[in-house]
């Protein structure tokens, strides 16, 4: 409330002011008889109370008038000379009240007048009775209240405060809010939820808030509108998935040609955004289908990273709200399929509209899954057959002398230029042909770009040939070439590892082909904060933790046996197949680098299968350059039959006196005559005399 000027005296007694107002028709509207007359104003004997001096800058009267205009107007009205002349002395009030009560035939003036109140009391309107009905009908102005009750009285005059049942119960609260802010003027601190006046998310003049790490303004939360969308698995969804796969294979120039045909402005559009826009025009109901791997941010929301972009961040990534993440118990690395919503007015990204599948299963199953760390690892027991072509001798040799099982932790020790890349390509073809149920991920770190393109062409060719036979192959290539920073190498490896873990939690068999562990460890040595403890070769003491974590994640999960009660009342046991994670990684040796030797020594005893490539065999242009004597698998009796074990043992015993080159030449000659390993086993199982 503004300060009262010193040259204007206000009435200090609030009760006296209220009683005086009852007599005048200007304040209450009650007709006053002529014989009452008027009372002369007594001299003002109130003393002026000195106001304390205010330090600092003087307040701007215009600013205060804007904040509390109603209060300022009432104060000015009270301080006017005309208003001061209307004041009645205290002595003439009693006689006036008595004559007024006799005129209306009541015992007390309180029966016809509203109760007297002060600014410190809570205002309560008088009850509606027959005696004061005349007063309420002819009343035009309310009694001027004091301080905060002014807004309440104004609300009453406007009909906001009523005594009937149809009155607004929140009118009093609204009046109080108006009194605080000045005629209902909204406080700007409560208007902007994301602006600089927000109490819990204050931003500076650059609209940044580095203190609380809330620079990213989350998009509008998920709204369940699945009732208006086609059901999962319907023809519309299947067609949308086909269009997504079709547009995904097209290049940017081909997508732009389609955009021109459909009259779409593709300027400033990236490939993924243009893909979504063309999908919405092609699909029924303008629905958009997508698939990606979830990455959860520290703020709680997430984004879908695309394998085509090697799981790197992009402006076209799909936004996943916190509600969806909490609803389905989603984690980083989950493979999500569903429908996408186009950006709204203030949205920056495409957002997830509905989740249809998670890790190729129903989303509700993810709520009951067991974390990867709590699964029980065992030795591999199910063999992965690598024999797929009679002319590919490398996989036939591996299938017999160094078998690989589901959950194997395999390491290929290869000097430079010994054919490790070709060997991985043949293993990829063998797994895709013999085990289409396995999810295959090829991870290339610090490799040459042309090798990445070659591997992707191989995967595409495998998928197309399998699709012609009606078989769906789940395989992909994720790469980070040598011209990218080390941070990209570690990020890609982490996303692939988390994706594989989530698939294993969903009882899936996953195989990761890693090329190579050595380059992966080099990149991690550059990225991590140095501990100050340097090993030989310049390797930090903590540099091998993440590569070991990656390589050590390979395991076979123990199957779960549970009892099931049949319909006839008998109890039987049911075996629930769990998943497995197989990692086949390559390690560089004989490179002349001390760091590579240290990395090799760290991983030497961690794998349970080793395949050694010999440089001397490769120099003589003999492929594959496999050292049969140094290669082998731990617990191979769990993977090989007794016939296969005897055949491998007889061949090794009969070739002890020969060189590595001679052993490989003899084995290749024998395989060229025999088309399958079954025929080879029949020959090798016979002991030499």
Curated annotation (Swiss-Prot):
- Composition-biased stretches, type Low complexity, lie in 170-183, 191-213
Question: What is the official name of this protein in its record?
Answer: Transcription termination factor Rho
Cite the InterPro entries for this sequence: AAA+_ATPase, ATPase_F1/V1/A1_a/bsu_nucl-bd, CSD, NA-bd_OB-fold, P-loop_NTPase, Rho_factor_ATP-bd, Rho_RNA-bd, Term_rho
What protein family does this chain belong to? Belongs to the Rho family.
Gene Ontology process terms (BP): DNA-templated transcription termination
Q: Which GO-annotated molecular functions does the record name? A: ATP binding; ATP hydrolysis activity; ATP-dependent activity, acting on RNA; helicase activity; RNA binding
Q: Where is the signal peptide?
A: none
Bias class Basic residues marks the residues at 52-65
Feature: compositional bias, Polar residues: 1-20
Q: Which residues bind ATP?
A: 405-410, 417-422, 448
Species in which this protein is naturally found? Fibrobacter succinogenes (strain ATCC 19169 / S85)
Q: Does the keyword Membrane apply?
A: no
**What do we know about how this protein assembles, alone or with others?**
Homohexamer. The homohexamer assembles into an open ring structure.
Catalytic activity, EC: 3.6.4.-
């Amino acid at each position: 409330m503004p300060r009262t000027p010193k040259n204007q005296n206000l009435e200090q007694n609030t009760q006296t002011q209220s009683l005086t107002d009852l007599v005048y028709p200007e304040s209450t509207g009650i007709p006053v008889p002529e014989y009452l007359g008027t009372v002369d104003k007594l001299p003002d004997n109130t003393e002026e109370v000195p106001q304390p001096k205010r330090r600092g800058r003087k307040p701007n009267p215009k600013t205060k008038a804007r904040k509390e205009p109603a209060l300022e107007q009432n104060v000015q009205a009270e301080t006017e000379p005309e208003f001061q002349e209307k004041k009645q002395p205290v002595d003439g009030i009693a006689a006036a009240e008595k004559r007024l009560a006799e005129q209306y035939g009541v015992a007390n003036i309180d029966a016809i007048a509203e109760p007297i109140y002060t600014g410190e009391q809570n205002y309560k309107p008088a009850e509606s009775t027959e005696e004061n009905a005349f007063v309420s009908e002819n009343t035009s102005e309310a009694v001027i209240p004091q301080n905060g009750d002014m807004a309440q009285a104004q609300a009453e005059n406007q009909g906001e405060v009523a005594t009937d049942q149809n009155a607004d119960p929140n009118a009093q609260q609204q009046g109080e809010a108006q009194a605080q802010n000045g005629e209902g003027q909204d406080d700007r601190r409560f208007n902007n939820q994301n602006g600089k006046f927000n109490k819990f998310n204050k931003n500076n003049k650059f609209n940044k808030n580095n203190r609380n790490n809330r620079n990213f303004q989350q998009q509008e939360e998920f709204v369940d509108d699945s009732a208006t969308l086609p059901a999962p698995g319907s023809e519309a969804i299947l067609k949308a998935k086909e269009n997504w796969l079709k547009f995904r294979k097209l290049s940017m120039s081909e997508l732009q040609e389609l955009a021109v045909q459909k009259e779409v402005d593709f300027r400033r559009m990236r490939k993924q955004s243009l893909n979504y826009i063309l999908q919405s025009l092609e699909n029924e109901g303008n629905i958009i289908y997508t698939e990606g791997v979830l990455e959860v941010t520290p703020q709680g929301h997430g984004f879908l990273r695309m394998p085509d972009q090697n799981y790197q961040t992009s402006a076209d990534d799909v936004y996943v709200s916190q509600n969806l993440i909490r609803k389905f118990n989603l984690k980083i690395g989950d493979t999500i399929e569903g429908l996408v919503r186009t950006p709204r007015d203030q949205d920056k990204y495409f957002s997830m509209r509905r989740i249809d599948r998670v890790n190729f299963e129903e989303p509700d199953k993810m709520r009951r899954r067991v974390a990867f760390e709590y699964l029980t690892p065992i030795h591999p027991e199910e063999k992965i057959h690598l024999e797929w072509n009679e002319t590919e001798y490398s996989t036939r040799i591996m299938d017999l002398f160094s078998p690989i099982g589901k959950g194997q932790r395999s390491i290929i020790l290869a000097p430079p230029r010994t054919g490790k890349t070709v060997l991985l390509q043949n293993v990829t073809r063998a797994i895709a042909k013999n085990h289409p149920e396995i999810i295959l991920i090829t991870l290339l770190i610090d490799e040459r770009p042309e090798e990445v393109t070659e591997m992707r062409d191989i995967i595409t060719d495998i998928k197309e040939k399998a699709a012609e036979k009606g078989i769906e192959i789940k395989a992909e290539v994720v790469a980070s070439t040598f011209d990218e920073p080390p941070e990209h190498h570690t990020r890609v490896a982490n996303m692939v590892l988390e994706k594989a873990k989530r698939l294993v939690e969903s009882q899936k068999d996953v195989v990761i082909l890693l090329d190579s562990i050595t380059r992966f460890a080099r990149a991690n040595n550059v990225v991590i904060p140095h501990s100050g403890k340097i090993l030989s070769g310049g390797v930090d003491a903590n540099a091998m933790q993440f590569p070991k974590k990656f390589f050590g994640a390979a395991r076979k999960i123990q199957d779960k046996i549970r009892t099931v009660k049949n319909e006839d009342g008998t109890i039987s046991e049911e075996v629930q197949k769990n998943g497995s994670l197989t990692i086949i990684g390559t390690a560089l040796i004989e490179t002349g680098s001390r760091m590579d030797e240290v990395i090799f020594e760290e991983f030497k005893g961690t794998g349970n299968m080793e395949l050694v490539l010999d440089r001397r065999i490769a120099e003589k242009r003999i492929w594959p350059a496999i050292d049969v004597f140094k290669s082998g698998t731990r617990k191979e009796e769990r993977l090989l039959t007794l016939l296969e074990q005897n055949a491998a043992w007889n061949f090794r015993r009969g070739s002890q006196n020969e060189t590595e080159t001679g052993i490989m030449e003899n084995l290749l000659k024998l395989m060229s005559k025999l088309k399958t390993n079954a025929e080879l086993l029949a020959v090798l199982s016979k002991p030499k005399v």
